[in-house]
Amino acid sequence: MDVILLDKIGKLGNLGDQVAVKAGYGRNYLVPYGLAVPATKENVAAFEAQRAELEAQAAERKAEAEARAAQLSEIELSLVAKAGDEGKLFGSIGPRDLADALTQAGLDVVKSEVRMPEGPIRKTGEYDITLQLHAEVTSSVRIVVVAE
């Protein structure tokens, strides 16, 4: 199935690229979420007519993400959690907990933007957490976990 991408998608392509994807991926994910349209003659012509407008919107979203990244990179957040004698937490701190804590600190962060490749935090200490704000924009936030 050939589709025209309406946004930059990692490991697939950029805005306006015409790519071949498996039918299920296109039909069940890309098209319903507004990330692509089927590459018919009508859609190709309509996309070329709207290309400048879509590129301007994409550039605006990227600029907003870069502004958020600059704001977030200056933040050091302290979280208090119950922990044992050796610093091991009772429970863990995951992406949802971090997103909620950043939102309470006045920053607009959703759970899906938090990247924790090592898994949830299970010990007290300092951690650098990566936030994927846009396909091309990432930011790092320092999190300090202290025992209650």
Swiss-Prot record:
GO cellular component terms, semicolon-separated: ribonucleoprotein complex; ribosome
GO BP, sorted A to Z: translation
Alphabetical UniProt keywords: Ribonucleoprotein, Ribosomal protein, RNA-binding, rRNA-binding
Xref: SUPFAM superfamilies: L9 N-domain-like (SSF55658), Ribosomal protein L9 C-domain (SSF55653)
Pfam families named in the record: Ribosomal_L9_C (PF03948), Ribosomal_L9_N (PF01281)
Domain of life of the native organism: Bacteria
Gene3D superfamilies tied to this protein: Ribosomal protein L9, C-terminal domain (3.10.430.100), Ribosomal protein L9, N-terminal domain (3.40.5.10)
Molecular function GO labels: rRNA binding; structural constituent of ribosome
InterPro entries: Ribosomal_bL9, Ribosomal_bL9/RNase_H1_N, Ribosomal_bL9_bac/chp, Ribosomal_bL9_C, Ribosomal_bL9_C_sf, Ribosomal_bL9_N, Ribosomal_bL9_N_sf
Function field: Binds to the 23S rRNA.
Family, per entry: Belongs to the bacterial ribosomal protein bL9 family.
PANTHER family for this protein: 50S RIBOSOMAL PROTEIN L9
NCBIfam families in UniProt: L9
Protein name stated in the entry: Large ribosomal subunit protein bL9
Organism from which the protein derives: Chromohalobacter salexigens (strain ATCC BAA-138 / DSM 3043 / CIP 106854 / NCIMB 13768 / 1H11)
